[in-house]
Design a protein with these regions (language model features):
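Short histidine-centered catalytic/ligand-binding loop motif
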Residues: 98-105
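Acidic/polar active-site rim loop that often engages polyanionic ligands
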Residues: 93-97
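Extracellular glycan/ECM-engagement signal in secreted proteins
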Residues: 193
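Basic, often amphipathic N-terminal segments
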Residues: 1-83, 89-92, 111-190, 199-220
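Soluble or luminal CAZymes and related metallo-dependent hydrolases
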Residues: 108
């Protein structure tokens, strides 16, 4: 059974469908080809491509309540149409370039983000350093988690799928922007280094398609 630390770095996310995950993983491999020590190696098991909705440190004992709140929100929300419109890049706190698929901030996505943020905010716990994360985590990872509410939430929310460290070309063979898809699943994840999604703690379908909560125990 997967054991959580007393304080857990969590990320409430939207999971893209399989073809979009594969597209992100392929772009990540292109970055790693030029930077094998890039630090982020996306895959479908231990480092999921995702769209962050809310990040926070939370007590492990509060996670069942957080899961229940996210489940209620997810069941009131239909699957969301999304558009990747470009490759976005920014400088990390260590000076490297981070590339991502930028996603247009549709009104429904902004509302989902705001609703989830308001629902989980009461569970924010005092930070506990790198021990909150799955595996090793650097000081910039801790800082990214703790700054989310101030620098990346509400009016500053900028949805994206992080691809990795490096300068991803804005024109990628086989990918024509804008690229549209539908997100139909949400999840609560345990964060790893670089605020990657290392473990799925619970997963939910968007929309009232099942009578019971779809939260599941961690896969690993």
């Amino acid at each position: 059974m997967y054991e959580l630390p007393d304080t857990v770095a969590i990320d409430v996310v939207l999971l893209p469908p399989g073809p979009i995950m594969d597209m992100a993983i392929g772009a990540n491999r292109a970055l790693l080809a030029g930077n094998p020590d890039g630090g982020i190696r996306l895959d479908r098991a231990n480092c999921l491509p995702h769209i962050s909705v809310a990040m926070l440190p939370a007590k492990s004992g509060d996670i069942p309540e957080i899961n229940a709140r996210v489940d209620r929100i997810a069941r009131r929300c239909s699957p969301m149409a999304m558009t990747i419109d470009a490759v976005a890049k920014h400088r990390s706190s260590t000076g490297g370039t981070v590339s991502a698929f930028h996603i247009l901030r549709a009104e429904i996505l902004q509302l989902f983000h705001k609703t989830v943020m308001n629902a989980v905010k009461p569970y924010q716990a005092p930070p506990a350093g790198p021990a909150m994360f799955a595996g090793e985590a650097s000081a910039p990872s801790v800082d990214c988690l703790l700054r989310f509410g101030k620098t990346s939430a509400y009016e500053r929310y900028s949805p994206h799928i992080t691809i990795g460290f490096g300068d991803l070309p804005e024109i990628i063979p086989g990918i024509d922007f804008p690229f549209r898809f539908e997100a139909a699943k949400a999840a609560v994840c345990h964060l790893g280094s670089h605020c990657t999604c290392r473990r799925v703690l619970a997963e939910f379908d968007l929309g009232p398609r099942t009578p019971a909560a779809r939260g599941r125990a961690a896969r690993r």
